């Protein structure tokens, strides 16, 4: 029996849930009231940061299985997360949180360029901008504030990575220990926004010694936060001095169907595992040794318009496993400057890494997003 809460009237989950409440997942007490009324046995936030503190809050109030509210709250607030990193011996960029544009503008001398400006409480790179000069700092701050529910932004020095792709994906924690290392390459499209994820691929292109450093960092973080179970979405980089820098860590599964991709790689149902953990049930899923060469790509447009169709090249069609469209002809399409403007997603399986790299590095040649003018 599944109860779903959301403030969006068009949430597609309402058609498969047993009960739907038009309640915002950020309204902790309203969700608690629903949970009490329905006498739920577990509560789970999925694929988005804002609902995660609510799930932990309700879990603690009703004495249900949950990760500590204080830990979840740290992970969902970027300035608190940066403070946690600094206080616990992890690498953290020079950063500062602000509640007004004026305060941030007056404090730029604190930082070395490039910097990244972003809301403290958003995910999917919504509201984030990288600045290589201070010329457009006002625009970047206004953009970041427009995506912050708490009306608070963070400015931090931007860490340059030594490897080709940001390290991302999901890990799965059971009894405090990471049991699935779903680390993936994070792909970007610099034509639209170098910060917004456009896809993931596996296997991870990283030296084994660096993989070990990443794993040690994440397990240590789970220990210090007291994270006991569930999916944790991660983003990290390693700099030229071989230092691991955690960029974002979210106490929930990743968006863009990351659990589905990891399911193919590990032969395990990570969604089922997350639900079982949240219910306090034993996890009986068999997790296989990771195998294969897989990728996802978020279908997107470089401009605004009216959706007509998306055409794939014959070469790409050889490797397509699944295609999911979110738009239909006639729908309005916006330039892909944040993850919410995705047009759909495709899953691919390749025979080897070389083939995957060849296709994934030239996706604009293999996908034709056809629009009509507005």
Where are these regions (language model features)?
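ATP-binding N-terminal substructure of ATP-dependent carboxylate-amine bond-forming enzymes
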Residues: 1-71, 102, 280-284, 301, ...
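A conserved helix-loop-beta module that forms one wall/lid of the active-site cleft
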Residues: 60-127
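Conserved ATP-binding module of the ATP-grasp superfamily
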Residues: 91-93, 114-117, 129-165, 194, ...
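Short beta-strand-to-turn element immediately C-terminal to the catalytic PLP-Schiff-base lysine
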Residues: 98, 128-133, 172-174, 239
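Beta-strand scaffold of nucleotide-dependent catalytic cores
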Residues: 129, 139-144, 156, 165-187, ...
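Short, well-ordered beta-strand elements within core beta-sheets of diverse protein domains
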Residues: 129, 157, 203, 263, ...
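Active-site "cap" helix and flanking loop/linker of ATP-utilizing ligase/carboxylase catalytic domains
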Residues: 212-234, 240-241, 250-305
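Glycine-rich active-site loop/lid that clamps phosphate-bearing ligands
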Residues: 299-331
């Amino acid at each position: 029996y599944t109860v779903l809460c959301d403030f969006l009237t068009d949430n597609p989950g309402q058609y498969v849930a047993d009960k739907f409440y038009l309640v915002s997942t950020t309204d902790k007490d309203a969700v608690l009231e629903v949970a009490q009324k329905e006498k739920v046995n577990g509560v789970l936030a999925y694929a988005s940061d804002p609902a995660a503190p609510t799930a932990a809050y309700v879990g603690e109030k009703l004495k249900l299985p949950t990760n500590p509210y204080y830990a979840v709250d740290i992970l969902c607030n970027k300035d608190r997360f940066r403070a946690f990193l600094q206080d616990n011996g992890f690498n953290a960029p020079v950063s500062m949180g602000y509640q007004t544009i004026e305060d941030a503008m007056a404090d730029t001398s604190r930082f070395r360029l490039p910097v990244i400006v972003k809301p403290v409480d958003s995910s999917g790179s919504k509201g984030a901008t990288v600045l290589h000069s201070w010329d457009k700092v006002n625009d970047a701050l206004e953009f970041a504030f427009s995506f912050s529910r708490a009306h608070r932004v963070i400015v931090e020095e931007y860490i340059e990575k030594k490897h080709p792709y940001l390290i991302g994906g999901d890990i799965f924690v059971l009894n405090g220990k990471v049991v699935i290392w779903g680390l993936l390459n994070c792909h970007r499209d610099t034509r639209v926004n170098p910060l917004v994820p456009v896809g993931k691929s596996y296997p991870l292109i990283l030296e084994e010694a660096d993989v070990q450093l990443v794993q040690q960092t994440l397990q240590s973080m789970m220990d210090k936060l007291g994270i006991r179970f569930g999916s944790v979405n991660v983003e990290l980089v390693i700099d030229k001095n071989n230092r691991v820098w955690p960029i974002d860590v979210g106490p929930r599964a990743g968006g863009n169907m990351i659990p589905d991709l990891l399911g193919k790689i590990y032969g395990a149902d990570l969604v089922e595992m997350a639900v079982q953990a949240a219910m306090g049930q034993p996890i009986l899923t068999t997790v296989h040794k990771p195998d294969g060469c897989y990728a996802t790509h978020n279908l997107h447009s470089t401009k605004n318009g009216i959706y007509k169709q998306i055409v794939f090249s014959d070469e790409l069609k050889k490797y397509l496993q699944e295609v999911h469209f979110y738009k239909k002809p006639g729908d309005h399409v916006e330039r892909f400057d944040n993850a919410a403007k995705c047009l759909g997603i495709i899953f691919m399986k390749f025979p080897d890494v070389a083939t995957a790299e060849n296709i994934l590095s030239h996706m604009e040649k293999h996908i034709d997003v056809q629009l009509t003018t507005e």
